[in-house]
């Protein structure tokens, strides 16, 4: 007997059973991070209202904030037009989404002309990662 929710049938997972997931601040619209979700992670996220991802490096579910305390409360889940990307509109607890201690994982901007361009860090560290992951 299949206990998977019917809405899951519209979600297109890749050959590894994963789908990219974009976490966006529900209030400001700032993109916080991109991660991956498995069916189990997406189902748990929808059921609990807390963001759960699939850690490709650890090969297990990653409940955002389980180590750092910086959980994501999900306000809304959206599916893109092709069904192959999830958007999570979240409240980021602690204001830190990135393991580097920044609000967003997108803290570097490309500056300069094509051949002279370089990535410049534009967002500050809000909390030392060594204090987050101790």
Swiss-Prot record:
It catalyses: 1-(5-phospho-beta-D-ribosyl)-5'-AMP + H2O = 1-(5-phospho-beta-D-ribosyl)-5-[(5-phospho-beta-D-ribosylamino)methylideneamino]imidazole-4-carboxamide. This is Phosphoribosyl-AMP cyclohydrolase. Its main location: cytoplasm. Homodimer. GO terms for molecular function: magnesium ion binding; phosphoribosyl-AMP cyclohydrolase activity; zinc ion binding. GO terms for biological process: L-histidine biosynthetic process. Mg(2+) binds at residues 80, 82, 84. Its cofactor is Mg(2+); Zn(2+). Keywords: Amino-acid biosynthesis, Cytoplasm, Histidine biosynthesis, Hydrolase, Magnesium, Metal-binding, Zinc. GO terms for cellular component: cytoplasm. InterPro entries: PRA-CH (IPR026660), PRib_AMP_CycHydrolase_dom (IPR002496), PRib_AMP_CycHydrolase_sf (IPR038019). Zn(2+) binds at residues 81, 98, 105. Catalyzes the hydrolysis of the adenine ring of phosphoribosyl-AMP. Its EC number is 3.5.4.19. It is found in: Cytoplasm. NCBIfam families: PRK00051.1 (NF000768).
């Amino acid at each position: 007997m299949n206990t998977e929710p019917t809405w899951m049938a519209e979600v297109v997972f890749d050959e590894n059973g994963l789908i990219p997931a974009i976490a966006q601040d529900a209030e400001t619209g700032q993109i916080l991070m991109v991660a991956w979700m498995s069916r189990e992670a997406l189902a748990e996220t929808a059921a609990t209202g807390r963001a759960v991802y699939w850690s490709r490096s650890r090969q297990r579910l990653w409940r955002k904030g389980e180590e750092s305390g910086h959980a994501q409360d999900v306000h809304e889940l959206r599916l893109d037009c092709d069904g192959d990307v999830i958007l999570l509109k979240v409240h980021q607890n602690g204001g830190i989404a990135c393991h580097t201690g920044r609000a967003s994982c997108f803290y570097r901007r490309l500056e300069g002309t094509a051949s002279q361009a370089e990535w410049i860090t534009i967002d500050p560290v809000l909390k030392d990662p060594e204090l987050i992951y101790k």
